């Protein structure tokens, strides 16, 4: 079974019933599922290529309505290693983990935190399931705070999966989550709704700084 989850995340002008903010919660419990979300168009092509070649169990890709970043699509496709995250930048104080469309917000948060003199790691997880547990554990032990970003409700989402894993291995580094609240989100422009519900780089920066004390 291969699932392409269109409108994964906030759907904006399509109306409140079209927001795809619950799918991680109802898919991540399926045994053996490979669940992916790309940060840009190139990665989306690679994930489709990887999905087509993967035959060991069910797989799914969640992707948004409209463009992701406007990246020109490359000609050469690549098979992604299942469950392997991309460490975009190393850091020692804070690790930011930006899933899919929220990677850009993580990038902006990184710039703001670095302006405060902090050493900030930036991670593109690629896989919701299986998680790259080695990368997660490395940065949870190395950094003082982790912060996850996802276009999904907080309950049973990607950040919850990260917390579940770290708790299971006895790592108690604080994890701040930037995600949608446990409610039905109204109709509106994505940027307006993100401002209204606190899904911005400014809010993320404030929350991380508060965790650092």
Regions found by a protein language model. Give the residues of each.
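Short glycine-/polar-rich loops that comprise or flank the Walker A/P-loop
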Residues: 1, 32-33
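Thiamine diphosphate
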Residues: 4-20, 53-213
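Internal gly/pro-rich beta-alpha loop/helix module
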Residues: 13-30, 37, 41-52
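Short, structured coil segments at secondary-structure junctions
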Residues: 30-31, 171
